């Protein structure tokens, strides 16, 4: 029997407001434990929450960027549960009237485009953070009360690769709106996945399992890949899928049972009595709409139509707002668009991945990389020499022009000087000339290599090829 996988994702995004959602405490990451708290966050008796208006602005901006309808008459609700990182024994969230609903994003994966629906986006407060040491646990309440939006997809995702593409696109859009930095390593973007399988052709959903401990997009994909196989094995052996919560173990690549899943009724939602209903008038909504910047899809379209990039290259560039903004600044500084894109997608991305860094953590600037690209474009240096210049720029910064000058890296483009070297190489390699004339194309590569060796890699490659062809034809 063949099964179809059905996946829905719940993504929590911390909003980068200066203060928390219901208290004036700072909402910044990295402070000493239990220093960014107030009596409101800790649930002291008699204190009342006050809604941070910036949180509503940010939530609306994110929802609109995800093509959602804004609920202009909304409210908050209490979600009741007890856990050590939740000092009030309830969380202020939104239940039946989320601020955003009925959205969608388009993803590109495995050669096709697919629209994934988004059920809802709602505001809520984050919980504290537990850490475990030996036979006891520690709790840090700095995160308690940090503003969140939870973004819930429709069960439209059918493969782990689609889930990965959805998360990449969602993260990109949120970063472009500037409401969150979406750093998974700091917990400002977290994802839970719901997955079930059903026989192909069956309309009714199977029993779902929720996956947690998904600390990277790759772990989301791996966890889903394992879980769809596990569920298929259970059904094919005559078993029944239980509704449960499982965690992904990155060491084994398997999912492990945590607990039987609670239903919505277990949380005993009811309207938050300490907050009035929230009314969003048309003027407020229109102001937030006007603040939405150019989003990835629009920027990709502009790169293709105005800068002549291929749809693939444009799509790769716009996924990361940091990379895309850097590219834009390079263009402003006069660099060629296609060559700039090649460097950013190639050597720059390879370096960042290898070193696990962001662009801001390097000595590169749009100005110095644009200067290097212009030196390649005007023939001052070759792309090969450019790699040497790049290695210096990314570590130490400075001026590309000065590096080329100080290290004597200017490309040899003087035809007379190159002709002398070409002639000498040909005189010393008669067999290679003969091989080339007999159809062995590799021989020309050997000859080019000898010339590059003689010039320490500084010969102009197109000129070398032209002179070689001319001089071989004469012999």
Curated annotation (Swiss-Prot):
Catalytic activity: L-glutamyl-tRNA(Gln) + L-glutamine + ATP + H2O = L-glutaminyl-tRNA(Gln) + L-glutamate + ADP + phosphate + H(+); L-aspartyl-tRNA(Asn) + L-glutamine + ATP + H2O = L-asparaginyl-tRNA(Asn) + L-glutamate + ADP + phosphate + 2 H(+)
Gene Ontology biological process terms in this record: glutaminyl-tRNAGln biosynthesis via transamidation; translation
Gene Ontology molecular function: any one: glutaminyl-tRNA synthase (glutamine-hydrolyzing) activity
Pfam families reported for this sequence: GatB_N, GatB_Yqey
Gene: gatB
UniProt keyword DNA-binding, yes or no: no
Keywords: ATP-binding, Ligase, Nucleotide-binding, Protein biosynthesis
Protein name: Aspartyl/glutamyl-tRNA(Asn/Gln) amidotransferase subunit B
Subunit text: Heterotrimer of A, B and C subunits.
Enzyme class, UniProt record, top EC level: ligase
EC identifiers of the protein: 6.3.5.-
Function: Allows the formation of correctly charged Asn-tRNA(Asn) or Gln-tRNA(Gln) through the transamidation of misacylated Asp-tRNA(Asn) or Glu-tRNA(Gln) in organisms which lack either or both of asparaginyl-tRNA or glutaminyl-tRNA synthetases. The reaction takes place in the presence of glutamine and ATP through an activated phospho-Asp-tRNA(Asn) or phospho-Glu-tRNA(Gln).
InterPro entries named among the record's database cross-references: Asn/Gln-tRNA_amidoTrfase_suB/E, Asn/Gln-tRNA_Trfase_suB/E_cat, Asn/Gln_amidotransferase, Asn/Gln_tRNA_amidoTrase-B-like, GatB, GatB_C_1, GatB_Yqey_C_2, Gln-tRNA_amidoTrfase_suB_CS
Family: Belongs to the GatB/GatE family. GatB subfamily.
């Amino acid at each position: 029997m063949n099964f179809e996988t059905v996946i829905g994702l719940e993504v929590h995004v911390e909003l980068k407001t200066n203060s928390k959602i219901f208290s004036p405490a700072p909402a910044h990451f990295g402070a000493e434990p239990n220093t960014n708290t107030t009596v409101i966050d800790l649930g002291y008796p008699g204190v009342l929450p006050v809604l941070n208006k910036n949180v509503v602005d940010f939530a609306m901006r994110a929802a609109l960027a995800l093509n959602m309808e804004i609920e202009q008459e909304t409210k908050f609700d209490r979600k009741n549960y007890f856990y050590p990182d939740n000092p009030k024994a309830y969380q202020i969230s939104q239940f039946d009237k989320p601020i955003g609903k009925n959205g969608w994003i388009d993803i590109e994966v495995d050669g096709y485009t697919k629209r994934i629906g988004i059920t809802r986006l709602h505001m809520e407060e984050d919980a504290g953070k537990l850490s475990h040491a030996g036979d006891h646990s520690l709790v840090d309440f700095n995160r308690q009360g940090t503003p969140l939006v939870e973004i819930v997809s429709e069960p439209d995702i059918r493969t782990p690769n689609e889930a990965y593409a959805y998360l990449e696109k969602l993260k990109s859009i949120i970063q472009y709106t500037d409401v969150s930095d979406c750093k998974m390593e700091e917990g400002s973007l977290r994802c839970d996945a719901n997955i079930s399988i059903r026989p192909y052709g069956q309309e009714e959903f199977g029993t779902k399992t929720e996956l947690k401990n998904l600390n990277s997009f790759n772990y989301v994909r791996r966890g889903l890949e394992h879980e769809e196989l596990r569920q298929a094995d259970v059904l094919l052996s005559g078993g029944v899928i239980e509704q449960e919560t499982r965690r992904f173990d990155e060491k084994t690549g398997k999912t492990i049972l945590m607990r039987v899943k609670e239903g919505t009724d277990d949380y005993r939602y009811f309207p938050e009595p300490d907050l009035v209903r929230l009314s969003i008038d048309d003027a407020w909504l229109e102001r937030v709409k006007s603040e939405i910047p150019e989003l990835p899809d629009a920027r990709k379209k502009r790169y293709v139509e105005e800068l002549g990039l291929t749809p693939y290259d444009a799509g790769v560039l716009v996924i990361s707002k940091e990379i895309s903004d850097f590219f834009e600044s390079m263009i402003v500084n006069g660099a060629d668009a296609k060559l700039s894109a090649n460097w950013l997608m190639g050597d720059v991305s390879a370096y960042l991945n290898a070193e696990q860094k962001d662009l801001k953590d390097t000595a590169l600037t749009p100005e110095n990389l644009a200067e290097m690209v212009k030196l390649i474009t005007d023939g001052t240096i070759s792309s090969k020499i450019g790699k040497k210049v790049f290695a210096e720029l990314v570590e130490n910064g400075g001026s590309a022009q000065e590096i080329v000058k100080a290290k004597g890296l200017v490309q040899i483009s003087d035809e007379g000087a190159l002709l002398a070297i070409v002639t000498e190489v040909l005189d010393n390699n008669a067999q290679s000339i003969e091989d080339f004339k007999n159809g062995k194309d590799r021989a020309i590569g050997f000859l080019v290599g000898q010339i590059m060796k003689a010039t320490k890699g500084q010969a102009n490659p197109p000129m070398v090829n032209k002179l070689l062809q001319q001089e071989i034809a004469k012999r």
